């Protein structure tokens, strides 16, 4: 049994423009080297472009894109009797949100490397793709689901 105590959750202050904790977390994911103002400029720019393209509010586009990418199941490695099994487990909501934010950022960064577009444009495109249940982040989620479905037989090895 571990002697260390459980780490306290940090309280994240909502972002200044939309007053949303989720958006503040997304800005933290996008942020590199502590450059918060640059990360805010990128995220707010991408959201305003998405808002102009679709015609819905920026927060509704962001929240529905996030909900479409959030995973419900994932696989975890569990070693039993010298054999490692990929055991499907349900994802807690906090981890699910964190994964979705990371996947959207990662998909936009991958698109940025492939094209000569600015990161803001790639992030806008990725948010719109996730909103429409397509794109790189949604594809990552579907791959995770396929892995969980393929290893459904090992679900009785759940973690305690």
From Swiss-Prot:
The keyword Ribonucleoprotein appears for this protein: yes
GO annotation terms (biological process): translation
GO molecular function terms noted in the UniProt entry: rRNA binding; structural constituent of ribosome; tRNA binding
Pfam families: Ribosomal_S7
Keyword annotations from UniProtKB, A to Z: Ribonucleoprotein, Ribosomal protein, RNA-binding, rRNA-binding, tRNA-binding
GO CC, any one term: small ribosomal subunit
Listed InterPro entries: Ribosomal_uS7, Ribosomal_uS7_bac/org-type, Ribosomal_uS7_dom, Ribosomal_uS7_dom_sf
Stated role: One of the primary rRNA binding proteins, it binds directly to 16S rRNA where it nucleates assembly of the head domain of the 30S subunit. Is located at the subunit interface close to the decoding center, probably blocks exit of the E-site tRNA.
Membership in a protein family: Belongs to the universal ribosomal protein uS7 family.
Quaternary structure annotation from Swiss-Prot or TrEMBL: Part of the 30S ribosomal subunit. Contacts proteins S9 and S11.
Protein name, as recorded: Small ribosomal subunit protein uS7
